[in-house]
Amino acid sequence: MMYRVNHIMRTINEMSSYTPHMKVNRIAERLSKVQKISFCISVISFFLLAIITLTYGPFNTKSNLSFISALSLYFINVIMGVTYLSVPVINTIKYIYNFKGEVVNELIYDIDSDEQHIEALLPYSLEELTYVSNCIQVRIPKIKSKCFLWGGGKTAIISILCLSYSAICIVNGGSIDGIFVGETGDKIIVAIMFFILYTSLMNMFFKQKLLYLQNLKMIIDMTIKIKRNFT
């Protein structure tokens, strides 16, 4: 028997465009967008700064324009990094200030969103939904195995800020030695920062993918329970 897996996956893929009927927490939604945008800008500006730093000496690109560009990218990094790290603090303060209201609003938002998603999956049979749920379940452990034990957005931003500082010091006429603790220690610190940045970015990717699959499985499993109990 051929199940309509492709149809179900298309329906699931379209769920991202669904929006709950009531936007009960617009401030949190906007803060989340600000955090995502600031992270993307921070990563892009860091890689541009890294390119300028790598070409600054060996390729004789030293000029006022290069230095001003590097300095501008550094300040953009600092501003975006501080913005990214500040959003969770603002969210926490807002949550504590109106704890009951935030909990209720979050619950209403989640239930309303889940109901729309479940409604879109109800036309499919129990066998089809169970099959897709099992397919997702099989893939979840594989993604979990690729995740590191630590690392995420905050560690990525902190490592970017440290590496950006070392980059601007090099562009300003210094060297990698003497930026933090001196000589070999600085090279080790920079290497560790690059490793932290790499693991953090990989962790963010795989955890986002894992969270997405877990949410899909939860919605499909809820749909299965509803079909079994009420149809």
UniProtKB/Swiss-Prot annotation:
The chain crosses the membrane at residues 39-59, 70-90, 156-176, 189-206. This is Uncharacterized protein YuaM. Keywords: Cell membrane, Membrane, Plasmid, Transmembrane, Transmembrane helix. Belongs to the FliR/MopE/SpaR family. The keyword Ubl conjugation does not apply. GO terms for cellular component: plasma membrane. It is a multi-pass membrane protein. The keyword Amino-acid biosynthesis does not apply. It comes from Escherichia coli (strain K12). It is found in: Cell membrane.
